[in-house]
Design a protein with these regions (language model features):
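Helix-start (N-cap) detector for alpha-helical repeat units in TPR-like alpha-solenoids
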Residues: 72-73, 106-107, 140-141, 174, ...
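N-terminal leader/linker segments that initiate helical-solenoid repeat arrays
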Residues: 1-77, 85, 93
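Position-specific recognition of the canonical hydrophobic site in helix A of tetratricopeptide repeat
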Residues: 83, 110-113, 117, 151, ...
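Canonical tetratricopeptide repeat
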Residues: 77, 111, 145, 192, ...
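Conserved structural position within tetratricopeptide repeats
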Residues: 63-67, 97-100, 130-134, 168, ...
Length: 272
């Protein structure tokens, strides 16, 4: 059953909620959040004076880096200046250097991947995401970023294979606490896989994936909510309604308002 545009919108919001709830980071890409923060500070339309000031700052940092190429304070300063200028192409070089100097700080490599994706260097973005996942396989933001990159290029099979391989890797490493892959949040990755199937309107696979996720953690409200959303999309409102209520009862307080909004939307859909 094909949902209306507004219906699809709240379903998508619900899927985003259930996928990223309980995680410690925003779902917004790191680069986007930085740029939006700067724009909200009045930097979206730079005056000539501000442009000149930033250009002078950039030159100063570059002069320091000519003498001290590994000076991280100068690299961070140059990166921040380039971002304030909105010049992502020029931000790549200091980002690459910072990522190289700080291999354990995943934010630099993640920001590099997102910047390359923004400037349509998709091969470079893919390489950066893969490099990050090789050293930090538990980084769900990187996994989601690479998955979305594949999906945006209509590389659906690669996206699904990537997520499935991550689940397999996590399951194999579960008994080895020294393996970084043992830190992968398997339920969240399963929810990501289910979301891909949902967006492809492959509802049987989505439901099966959410069932597996629920079996992994019977106390997690997210697979229950996801199942309800899929059933709602199929027009199975009577089956969906008790699952929405169950998800609401299991969810932490911080997420109940959003779930209640989904339930109200579901009830409106039933009356129509």
């Amino acid at each position: 059953m094909k949902a209306s545009l507004s219906n699809r919108r709240w379903l998508s919001i619900g899927l985003i909620l259930m996928l990223f709830a309980l995680l410690s980071f925003s779902i917004m890409p790191l680069l986007t959040s930085i740029l939006q923060s700067q724009h909200s500070s009045g930097q979206s339309h730079l005056s000539a004076v501000k442009q000149e000031e930033l250009a002078s700052q950039a030159l100063g940092y570059q002069m320091v880096l000519e003498r001290e190429p590994d000076n991280q304070a100068a690299l961070r300063g140059l990166l921040d200046t380039r971002l304030q200028q909105g010049d992502l192409k020029q931000a790549i070089e200091p980002l690459e250097k910072l990522a190289q100097l700080n291999p354990q700080q995943s934010d630099y490599l993640l920001l590099l991947a997102e910047a390359k994706q923004q400037i349509e260097d998709y091969a470079g973005a893919t390489a950066s995401y893969r490099s990050l996942l090789a050293s930090h396989p538990q980084n769900l933001r990187a996994l989601t970023g690479l998955t979305n990159l594949f999906l945006s290029q209509n590389r659906h099979n690669e996206a699904i294979s990537l997520v499935k391989d991550t689940i397999d890797r996590a399951l194999k490493a579960a008994a080895d606490p020294n393996n970084p892959a043992s830190l992968i949040d398997i339920v969240s990755v399963q929810l990501l896989l289910g979301k891909i199937y949902f967006e492809q309107q492959n509802y049987p696979e989505a439901l099966n994936t959410y069932k597996q996720a629920q079996q992994m953690d019977v106390n997690d409200f997210r697979p229950i909510l996801a199942t309800a959303i899929v059933l709602k999309e199929q027009g199975k409102n009577q089956e969906a309604q008790p699952l929405f209520q169950e998800a609401l009862s299991r969810a932490p307080f911080a997420y109940r308002e959003e779930i209640q909004s989904l339930i109200r939307s579901q009830e409106i859909g039933v009356r129509r």
